[in-house]
């Protein structure tokens, strides 16, 4: 994994948080797809809309999860890339991290597509090495931070 991605996890969070504020639900999931250099290629969020791919995967109510939304927003010519990283964020209404591990329906296809999957926990982040058995996970010890400390509730950076 790129050191640039690891050192910029909180920067990516500041990109995800304003998008999370737009979601009316209490559980605000945001997914970013990055290339191996750490450039953001696509951003997705949980959507109440339906999609044929969601039905194929077997999501309840055929509703699109953030991981699938980010993949669908990715240019079709790029979807076969093997060095992509999935970053999953979940925030509560106070801007705190919550567990955003891909669900049982998302995990098999995510581990097949993404080289690494990084998701938030209450204590920071966890990394799953993709493109293999998803039970092998590596905990990344990065202290949790509250988005309110770096962003105002209006979604604009405070410093």
Q: Model regions: which residues?
A:
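Zinc-dependent deaminase catalytic domain
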Residues: 1-159
């Amino acid at each position: 994994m790129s050191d640039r991605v690891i050192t910029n996890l909180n920067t990516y969070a500041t990109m995800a948080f304003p998008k999370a504020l737009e979601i009316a639900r209490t559980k605000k999931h945001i997914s970013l797809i990055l290339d191996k250099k750490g450039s953001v290629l696509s951003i997705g969020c949980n959507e109440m809309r339906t999609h044929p791919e969601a039905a194929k995967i077997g999501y309840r109510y055929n509703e699109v999860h953030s991981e699938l939304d980010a993949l669908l927003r990715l240019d079709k010519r790029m979807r076969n890339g093997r060095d992509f990283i999935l970053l999953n964020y979940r925030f509560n209404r106070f801007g705190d991290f919550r567990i955003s591990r891909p669900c049982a329906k998302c995990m098999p296809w995510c581990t097949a597509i993404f080289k690494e999957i990084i998701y938030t926990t209450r204590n920071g982040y966890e990394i799953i090495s993709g493109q293999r058995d998803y039970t092998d996970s590596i905990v990344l010890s990065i202290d949790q931070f509250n988005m309110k400390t770096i962003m105002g509730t209006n979604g604009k950076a405070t410093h």
